[in-house]
Amino acid sequence: MANAYGFVGHSVPTMKRAAQFQQMGSGFCSADSISKRVFCCSVVQGADKPASGDSRTEYRTPRLVSRGCKLVGSGSAMPALQVSNDDLSKIVDTNDEWISVRTGIRNRRVLTGKESLTNLATVAARKALEMAQVDANDVDMVLMCTSTPEDLFGSAPQIQKALGCKKNPLAYDITAACSGFVLGLVSAACHIRGGGFNNILVIGADSLSRYVDWTDRGTCILFGDAAGAVLVQSCDAEEDGLFAFDLHSDGDGQRHLKAAITENGIDHAVGSNGSVSDFPPRSSSYSCIQMNGKEVFRFACRCVPQSIESALGKAGLNGSNIDWLLLHQANQRIIDAVATRLEVPQERVISNLANYGNTSAASIPLALDEAVRGGKVKAGHLIATAGFGAGLTWGSAIVRWG
């Protein structure tokens, strides 16, 4: 029986118990989520007419069919300017060995005044459409996963316009920092399974170089700019390519990684009688990225493998079933620690961190696109992917390519 949201009741597994929360030693929390895959339904080309002799004058309830989604195209783009560790050693007290040993990073790309993040995202999206052989006019949603939009109100509509989508498909931003792309994938799946959408572009793009303190060697060495995209397409439920996911947030960890709003200028007093104070408000901007690296490292090494194990369990799989482990490219030590915890050998771990640094929401689709175009990831391969970062927010998804 279909409910008001278009979901079929009997095909949605019920929760056997209430979510169980437990507090970690560091104060972070975890929770058990709804298990197993959920197949949703949407209308198939309207309703059936009543049979001959049927006394009802209204059309019957539209038929419903199960729907799945699959990843069918990828693309990526990055700025032209490459900044090496040696380049950074000229502006802060550091060197190539110090950076590469602690992070695994050797180079990163940085946007200049001649480039824009929106243009990078558009290029990546076009490449994904070309690989999938889908016309821009067949796209019915654009999701821009970013924490650094070039417009306060979001960049997705500008990308939709640049792509030339003539049917005005829905386009909006998702802000979840380095977890953004995974949340975008899950959001796309929900729109397809329950909302009747067919071709959704999920773009991860960030330019964190604009929010870096280039005198702080603890953070300026980490970040780069880039964009990556995938096309998520509807399919029959039997071909579904999103097997399971696991998503979490913990606002208590915000103190360890943030770029908080700051007030600029001076108070603009209104009148002289003191009846109105602090108005108009001061103009605001965001601070540079502030990070407690040790705490973020501990958080990632603890929560990410837990999340992936949870998603694998929901899918009825284990680490030996996956072909590739693809994590947010934040730090090679984190990637190695998670792979060791999951017993995934290094030859099945995708990493391009050395070339691009931490590109936030772009890191997973960028690495995926390079792996697909390089022949590593092939149709039918299973990928365990996970994002983690500011919020604190983290999540994982088990997906099949193609």
UniProtKB/Swiss-Prot annotation:
Annotated keywords: Chloroplast, Fatty acid biosynthesis, Fatty acid metabolism, Lipid biosynthesis, Lipid metabolism, Plastid, Transferase, Transit peptide
Catalytic reactions of this protein: malonyl-[ACP] + acetyl-CoA + H(+) = 3-oxobutanoyl-[ACP] + CO2 + CoA
Keyword Lipid biosynthesis: yes
Residues forming the catalytic site: C178, H328, N358
Pathway: Lipid metabolism; fatty acid biosynthesis
Record's GO cellular component terms: chloroplast
GO molecular function: 3-oxoacyl-[acyl-carrier-protein] synthase activity; beta-ketoacyl-acyl-carrier-protein synthase III activity
Claim: Iron is one of the keywords in the record: no
InterPro entries assigned to the protein according to its UniProt record, in alphabetical order: ACP_syn_III_C (IPR013747), ACP_syn_III_N (IPR013751), FabH (IPR004655), Thiolase-like (IPR016039)
Localization in the cell: Plastid, Chloroplast
Domain of life: Eukaryota
GO BP: fatty acid biosynthetic process
Top class in the EC scheme: transferase
EC number in record: 2.3.1.180
Pfam families linked to this entry: ACP_syn_III, ACP_syn_III_C
Family to which this protein belongs: Belongs to the thiolase-like superfamily. FabH family.
Role: Catalyzes the condensation reaction of fatty acid synthesis by the addition to an acyl acceptor of two carbons from malonyl-ACP. KAS III catalyzes the first condensation reaction which initiates fatty acid synthesis and may therefore play a role in governing the total rate of fatty acid production. Possesses both acetoacetyl-ACP synthase and acetyl transacylase activities.
Listed name of the protein: Beta-ketoacyl-[acyl-carrier-protein] synthase III B, chloroplastic
Species in which this protein is naturally found: Cuphea wrightii
